[in-house]
Amino acid sequence: MKLLKKGAEADIYLTSWNGKEAILKIREKKDYLNPVLDRRIREQRTIRESGIISNVKSFGICTPLVYFVDTKKCEMYMQYIEGNLVRDLVNPRVIKTCEEIGRIVGTLHKNGVMHGDLTTSNFIVMKDKVFVIDFGLAQKT
């Protein structure tokens, strides 16, 4: 297991799931929060994120497949998307990619989903498809 990113809300690891490369997202305990409140927040965010990722797929938007969710450990195993973060693109694909991101965000909003953290670090381009990742702060509107 290899740490890919240490975030404010969760740590992201490259691992494997049933013989495939996978992402493991772990929501770590926050020592500065009341333990009961911390547990509830991490558990609710894990459940909400996995549900929204699956729901958004039904709109025709590319998101990672969710393989497994452990609500007790506040962990989620997902498909590893090998590609480039949008923030790292520095070629003519940027305009096309930005237009596609606009369409994706419009589709999300039209279908009552607010991502909650739209940054170039939360989109991955693989071949000609734009994948949306990190629905940890997403909400249904």
Predicted regions and their residues:
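Conserved protein kinase catalytic/activation segment
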Residues: 122-132
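Activation of the activation-loop gatekeeper triad in protein kinase-fold domains
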Residues: 134-139
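Conserved structural core of kinase catalytic domains
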Residues: 28, 42-46, 57-101
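Conserved hydrophobic "DFG−1" position in protein kinase catalytic cores
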Residues: 14-17, 68, 80, 125
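Catalytic-loop of the protein kinase fold
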Residues: 110-120
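Conserved hydrophobic alpha-helix
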Residues: 56, 104-108
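ATP-binding glycine-rich loop module of kinase domains
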Residues: 2-47
